Amino acid sequence: MSGLSASEAAQRLTRDGPNAQPQPDQRHWPRILASVLREPMLLLLIAASVLYLSVGEPRDAAALGLSVLLVVGLTLYQEVRAEHALQALRDLSSPWASAWRDGALQRVPATSLVVGDVVQVAEGDRVPADAKLLDSSDLHVDESLLTGESVPVARAPGADDAAARIHAGTLVVRGQAMAEVTATGSGTEMGRIGASLGALNREATPLQHEIRRLVLWFTAASIASCVLVFGLYLTLRGGWLDALLAGITLAMATIPEEFPVVLTVFLALGAWRMARLRVLVRRPPAIEALGSVTVLCTDKTGTLTENRMALTQLLTGGGMPHTPDQELDGDSLSLLRCAALASDANGFDPMDRAVHAVASASLPESTAADWEHLKHYPVTPALPAYATAWRRKHQPGLLLACKGAPEAVAALCGLADEDRSRVLADAASMAAEGLRVLAVADAHTTNADAPDSLENEAFTWRGLLGFADPLRAEVPAAVAEAHAAGVRVVLMTGDHIETARAIAIAAGISDHPEVTLGAALEQLDADALRALLARTDVFARVRPEHKLRLVQALRDAGEVVAMTGDGVNDAPALMAAHVGVAMGGRGTDVAREAASIVLLDDDFASVVRAIRMGRTIFANLQRATRYIVAVHVPIAGLALLPLLLGTPLILLPLHVVFLEMVIDPACSIVFEREPAEPDLMRRPPRPASTPLLDLRMIAASLLLGASAFALVLLVYMIASRAALAPPQTAALAFTALVVCNIALVQWHLAPSRSGIAGPTNVAFWITLVAVLALLACLTLLSAPAQWFGFIPVSLPAFFAAVAAPALSLAGAHWIIRRLRKVRVAGPVPTVPQDAGG
């Protein structure tokens, strides 16, 4: 099979477009702009601008008009940036397909398929495009996505037209096939009925619900205070214009429009940063759950190991071990030939490839050259072995070649107890060396047709194959980091008990692991299983239903579970876990769809990196929301001050816009880029019930904001006593307010560090320099000052207004840290290093 050439495929892709459905939820910038123009902050600015125009203040109206453009530009930048991150994730989450190109079977993005491509699909795959079958073996397809019928239907070439076709989006539940693509993208049956594939899930998350509650609470308080201030100002002071401006300013100062923006930006950019670590987030709740994971269940092959199988040992029925680099005797060659016939020469399975690599070098002729393939028998829970049926050309009878778990193949061969014990002891000895062990057997039959099942055939034991799959170099360090973070690592593998034990020791999961076989779990009730899980970290010969039961038992015990999987039957366990982790390289489409996270490199260390990133995102999101609560207190206080003191308005809508120019970048850029604290992965997992903001945090933020307002008030009172003009007093109070804003950013960035932000957060320093430069222009230069309703102040007064709040808050931060160190006896508690072992 040659398939299309790469150049022809590229030409057809240019002509027909990508194999993708439209994405109705994708937001381009005009749609984003329309949503920005409906923001409450913008509507208040427009209202204030119209108000200024109506009373003959065109300069103030123009200034607010310019500020409207600034707010629109900044908000549009944030939203477009988040949307670009989401689009990058959509591109990464696009499925892959196996297609013949330039005479070789290749893994290509499904979006690059074109009409005429020859694709190969197997159990667990989503069909990537509409196609006509060329060849198939026991193919059954779930077409419920198109027809609503849940019963899989058989498909085969040569049948009527409908039965010889497969359609995009349907699921292969059994067998395999080769097919020629006949339609792609919107031209498929799926496209014609208007379905959309590949879009990221945007369901509401617990954090989103919490943010909505905060927004509703603060909005209600904002509206109530705005109406109250307008009424009181009008009653006590008179002048509807000032009363209305005071109400609008207070509303702008207190409406919590930053909350939803911060959540959107953090989750989108957090998922994008994870993708750069080769971790694809398919569902937003996974980011929230990652920081709470207490148990990480992992398989072995390709996750803890490199999935780079090499056939290193052949052990025949005579008990003589051989290595492939030796000259093989007749029994070893027969073993190798049988293993090659039981392996897919064009597949992606690393053990199949390893067998064929040795067979092509060791066997005198092409193994399958004289054989016609008739049927294959996939692995099932009842028989963990793979077999194929072959007919030798020009000769009667059939050959059945089988390879699989030694126990299953031994039972298939009907070995006597003594022989069975011997071969299983050989398998255990090989497994104890860390080898992946498969048994090989064959059967000859005179029947003309391949049998429906293998159980009634007379199989002959041929021997054992030992595959070396080296442990990934970074796994021991990643396991140690997980243990230090209070995350227990549990190994669930289908491998031999001794292989599981050897890998667990090498990876550092446990020094002396107690290994339990999957079959033993079937004899345990819920209480016994819970007791077993409390002391066991390694499970061998585990089937998918065992994984599901283990995950459910861990959840029932109160653990937050992350689970890795790659097969069709792993989907229930992946969905049952709080965080399902599918393999992007070797995983099936079904597993990827069931999972909330996909590892693009199938690497265990990536899971631990994702846990670290999840903790970092939540910690930074918590910092940002606490800062939002704190920073609005001094702004609201300065907006209320004239009403309490009977002085002219200090804060105007334009001033609040300037403050928003500080608050929004601080939330969406500075906090989002704050690196993890050094001890983040030495702390226990965050309880899943931990809210983003609890009452204690809100009270602390309000108190911190009140302290900042007290400093602003102090500067204002000193300036008033210095007999400065009211616009100069307002300028100094505004300066102190902006500096307090920056100080609050720094305060919340790293509470465990000193009073000055760490040098790693470049975004903070850029924001600081830019804001202070603009602030100096607004308060020291005549023209900009007039636009803001100020009169320029002296340089010493400006420096005093900058230094007083900055030094006061930095000093308070330093004192609090000293008091904490005195109050805490000894170091901050960390998770014991042997946790999980």
Feature annotation, model-predicted:
Residues 68, 74, 104, 182-185, ...:
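Conserved beta-strand/loop elements of the cytosolic catalytic core of P-type E1-E2 ATPases, chiefly
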Residues 43-63, 217-255, 268, 272-278, ...:
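Helix-interface capping motifs at the ends of transmembrane segments in multi-pass membrane proteins
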Residues 2-3, 15-24, 73, 81-84, ...:
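Actuator/coupling domain of P-type ATPases
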Residues 18-99, 104-106, 151, 217, ...:
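Transmembrane helix-loop-helix hairpins at the membrane interface
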Residues 167-171, 289-418, 422-460, 467, ...:
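Cytosolic catalytic regions of ATP/NTP-dependent phosphoryl-transfer enzymes
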Residues 229, 267, 333, 347, ...:
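Membrane-embedded transport module
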Residues 63-94, 101, 203-298, 465, ...:
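Hydrophobic alpha-helical transmembrane segments
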Residues 63, 94-212, 334-336, 523-533, ...:
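Cytosolic catalytic regions of P-type ion-transporting ATPases
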